[in-house]
């Protein structure tokens, strides 16, 4: 039996949720498939969501937040 969990959607994203597929995540981050999945496993990259029986995607705002955090780290803003 499938277990459903209610996930609150932040108000700012309620009507602008965009799901990215792997090719789009690779293009946006400049990273390879293997490095993306290695970092997901290590907890260093956002996890994908299931969008079908054999398909996953990433929420664009989560990927963008990850990119923003990397920029801040590289410029000494976050430690």
Could you tell me what each predicted segment is?
Residues 2-42, 61-74:
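Polyanion-binding surface elements
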Residues 42-49:
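Short, solvent-exposed alpha-helical "recognition" segments
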Residues 49-55:
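Short Lys/Arg-enriched helix C-cap and helix-to-coil transition segments
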Residues 77-79:
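Amphipathic alpha-helical dimerization/coiled-coil segments
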């Amino acid at each position: 039996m499938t277990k459903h969990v209610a996930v609150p959607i932040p108000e700012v994203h309620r009507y602008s949720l965009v799901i990215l597929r792997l090719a789009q995540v690779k293009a946006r981050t400049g990273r390879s498939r293997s490095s993306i999945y290695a970092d997901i496993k290590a907890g260093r990259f956002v996890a994908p969501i299931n969008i079908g029986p054999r398909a996953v995607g990433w929420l664009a705002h989560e990927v963008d937040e990850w990119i923003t955090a990397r920029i801040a780290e590289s410029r000494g803003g976050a430690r």
